[in-house]
A protein has these predicted regions:
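Alpha-helical bundle/repeat cores within regulatory domains of eukaryotic proteins
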Residues: 112-173
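Extended alpha-helical interaction segments
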Residues: 1-122
Length: 173
């Protein structure tokens, strides 16, 4: 594939396609991944980053499955912090791998919900509050992998390079 500029993409999902193009070309170029095309909606740009992060994090969770299980990680911890899973009627303790799956399923469902995100061309202001909770929970999955499965995390990051751009995006936003 040849590289194309944002202006060349003629699609209602141009931001998604452009972000995927940037990631495909050079995931390590964090500055370029974070640079929103001129004249675009910042909320939609953040939304597309979260959507792409959820897709990419599925690869991390699959990579963790062999080492992170109910026996090795009976609770969702990052260092010594214990996190409860919000996927249940009442937040409760889950093993780390279940927490990761629940978190990704919940984030993906929420980001694809027509109730909260009826359009990918603009984000309704009442839905912006979900960005922070999604980001916080996804960060916990990264943190668990970093503190408890460093080798798998490092392997994932070397091939997919998602954590560092995402942290830069969150601290830049």
């Amino acid at each position: 594939w040849r590289e194309c500029s944002f202006d060349e993409i003629k699609s209602p999902l141009a931001l998604q396609e452009y972000l995927q193009e940037l990631a495909r070309m050079d995931r390590a170029n964090i500055g370029r991944l974070l640079q929103m095309p001129p004249g675009q909606n910042e909320d939609v740009w953040q939304y597309e980053h979260l959507r792409m992060l959820c897709v990419d994090m599925n690869y991390l969770v699959i990579q963790l499955e062999h080492e992170c299980n109910k026996e090795s990680c009976p609770e969702m911890k990052a260092a010594e912090w214990l996190f409860f899973c919000a996927a249940h009627a009442q937040p409760q303790s889950c093993c780390a791998i279940d927490y990761a799956f629940h978190t990704l399923d919940g984030a993906t469902s929420l980001l694809n919900s027509h109730k909260y995100f009826p359009s990918r061309q603009s984000i309704i202001s009442s839905s912006l509050k979900h960005f922070q909770s999604i980001a916080r929970r996804l960060y916990r999955v990264f943190a668990h992998a970093w503190f408890h499965h460093r080798e798998e995390f490092t392997s994932f990051e070397a091939s997919v390079a998602r954590c560092h751009p995402w942290i830069a995006h969150c601290t830049d936003a």
